[in-house]
A protein has these predicted regions:
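Structural motif
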Residues: 42-44, 109
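Catalytic cores of nucleic-acid endonucleases
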Residues: 51-114
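Surface-exposed, flexible loop/turn segments at secondary-structure boundaries
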Residues: 43, 53, 118
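Low-complexity intrinsically disordered segments
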Residues: 1-13, 151-175
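Conserved catalytic cores of phosphodiester-cleaving nucleases, focusing on short active-site segments
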Residues: 35-37, 44-50
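Short, low-complexity, polybasic intrinsically disordered segments
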Residues: 108-164
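Acidic-basic catalytic patches of nuclease active cores, encompassing PD-(D/E)XK
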Residues: 1-32, 38-40
């Protein structure tokens, strides 16, 4: 299965689905994570943010915009706007869909994979702090925490750390 330039081998998963498949009819106002994987003991909601994919079109304007995105990306990890306005709503909407389709019978882990090949090395402490803020937001978006905790854990990975967490799912960059 592929997302942009990242190709995954999910053949050992019990089930793997590209939830935000282009052309798929989505419920009004909902946004989904990229993939949902079902394993024997858990499900994984996988969101991919690949700052390293090539600029679309390849013209100088697109290349500059892509470079700006790479330069600005570490700042996204330092504030909560991305967490609150994009990542958490996608996770919640995806869970709501799974719940309404009676596919939330296993514990769910939320995984954010950052395609970071073209980024200057990301500070591991920055990623840990970001993961903690993301998980806290997934558990509590209002004054009170969710009574039903829909995500039991959260991981923030890069292409380099992906094989450490999921050696069973090969990841290859297709140029």
């Amino acid at each position: 299965m592929r997302e942009g330039e990242l190709d995954f081998n999910f053949s050992t998963a019990k089930n793997a689905e590209k939830l935000d498949e282009e052309g798929r009819k989505l419920p009004q106002g909902m946004k989904f994570v990229d993939f949902v994987l079902e394993e024997e003991e858990q499900s994984i909601m996988l969101e991919i943010k690949d700052t390293s994919c090539k600029a679309r079109g390849g013209d100088s304007k697109a290349v500059l915009a892509k470079q700006r995105e790479c330069d600005e990306f570490p700042k996204k990890l330092m504030n909560d706007e991305w967490v609150a306005h994009e990542l958490t709503p996608k996770a919640r909407d995806s869970y709501t869909f799974l719940h309404l389709m009676k596919r939330d019978t296993k514990p769910i882990i939320y995984v954010l994979l950052i395609g970071s090949e073209n980024l200057s090395p990301l500070d591991p402490a920055l990623l840990v702090a970001f993961k903690d803020r993301l998980f806290a937001r997934l558990c509590q978006e209002t004054e009170q925490p969710w009574v039903r905790q829909y995500v039991i854990d959260c991981l923030v990975l890069t292409e380099k750390t992906w094989p450490l967490a999921f050696p069973q799912y090969a990841l290859t960059r297709i140029s």
